[in-house]
């Protein structure tokens, strides 16, 4: 019989298991994981570098209707950094960024630190264990008819990246115990587009200002790098817009993403610039400012290829 069984050996599951043992070393804690190693999703965060957090935490960074003010007010950066040091994890921030990364720049460092700490604190980590059923009887929980615990914590994460094990199974378990699951929307993801020339832009990366327009009204603006793929828009600024798109599409709203490819110059400046090079082919003139692929698509889209600037 375990005092606590934690389902899911991701970041939250590992943190919880270690925190419980730090507070009470005598607790019998089990951490169960369906994969053959912990932190599988953690390994791919930050493009393999591991996102450890952000020091600029504010209420408007969250999309929940619940008030998190009391929770956020208790968060102290130094406390968190010292907490990570307990596991042997040193951190860094890049230039003016508020994002935290391991000093090694490798997510595997964080996972290995978790493994060593869990072993040191005598947490029983059970790998390749797929939870099918959780029941409650006789004042304790039973998992798959063979694991028993006084408390069970579901730390399985959401439904993103199912190849890492996040299939949404935890939601079903929670529902079976009467919990309410809020509606889920895709977030931090690319946006598919029906723009007819998108394939011609594949591979292009450039800094832009991207606006999310709903029924022709701008509701959100993001600045950053955009990446064009064969059928979609990607990049941090698009990821930040993505969480709102599904909500409005679900309401049958007209949703457009408008991209300013030259955000550092206004329209009149660009017009005057093009006039100064009126002997150029339009595509050549625009390609002095933008990626050649982008210039070609603009002139093709506007049917300007053979017209002088």
Predicted regions and their residues:
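N-terminal Rossmann-like FAD-binding beta1-loop-alpha1 element of flavoenzymes
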Residues: 2-31
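Short hydrophobic core segments
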Residues: 5-7, 32, 131, 147-166, ...
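Glycine-rich FAD pyrophosphate-binding loop
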Residues: 21-47
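Glycine-rich active-site loop/strand segments that organize a redox cofactor
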Residues: 46-96
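An anion/pyrophosphate-binding glycine-rich loop and adjacent beta-alpha core
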Residues: 52, 56, 90, 180-183, ...
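Short beta-strand to alpha-helix junction loop
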Residues: 68-76, 97-116, 161-166, 196, ...
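Short loop/edge segments at beta-strand edges and connector loops
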Residues: 125-129, 183-185
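A conserved short coil-to-beta-strand element within the FAD-binding core of flavoproteins
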Residues: 127-140
């Amino acid at each position: 019989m375990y005092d606590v069984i934690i389902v899911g050996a991701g970041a939250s599951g590992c943190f919880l298991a270690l925190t419980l043992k730090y507070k009470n070393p005598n607790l019998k804690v089990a951490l169960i994981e369906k994969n053959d190693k912990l932190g599988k999703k953690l390994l791919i965060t930050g493009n393999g570098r591991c996102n450890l957090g952000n020091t600029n935490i504010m209420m408007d960074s969250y999309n929940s209707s619940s008030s998190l003010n009391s929770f956020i007010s208790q968060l102290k950066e130094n406390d968190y950094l010292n907490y990570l040091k307990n596991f042997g994890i040193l951190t860094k921030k890049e230039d003016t960024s508020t994002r935290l990364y391991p000093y090694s720049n490798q997510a595997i460092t964080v996972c290995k630190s978790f493994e060593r700490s869990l072993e040191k604190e005598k947490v029983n980590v059970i790998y390749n264990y797929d939870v099918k059923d959780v029941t409650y009887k006789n004042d304790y929980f039973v998992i798959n008819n063979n694991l028993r615990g006084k408390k069970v914590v579901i730390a399985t994460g959401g439904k993103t990246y199912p190849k890492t094990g996040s299939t949404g199974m935890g939601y079903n378990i929670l529902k079976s115990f009467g919990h309410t699951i809020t509606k889920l929307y895709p977030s931090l993801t690319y946006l598919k587009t029906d723009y007819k020339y998108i394939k011609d832009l594949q591979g292009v990366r450039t800094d832009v200002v991207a606006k999310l327009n709903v029924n022709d009204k701008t509701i959100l603006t993001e600045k950053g790098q955009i990446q064009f793929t064969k059928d979609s828009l990607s990049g941090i600024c698009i990821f930040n817009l993505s969480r709102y798109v599904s909500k409005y599409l679900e309401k049958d709203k007209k949703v457009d993403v408008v991209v300013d490819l030259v955000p550092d110059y206004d329209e009149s400046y660009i017009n005057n610039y093009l006039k100064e090079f009126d002997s150029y082919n339009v595509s050549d003139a625009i390609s002095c400012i933008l990626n050649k692929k982008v210039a070609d698509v603009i002139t093709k889209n506007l049917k300007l290829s053979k017209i002088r600037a």
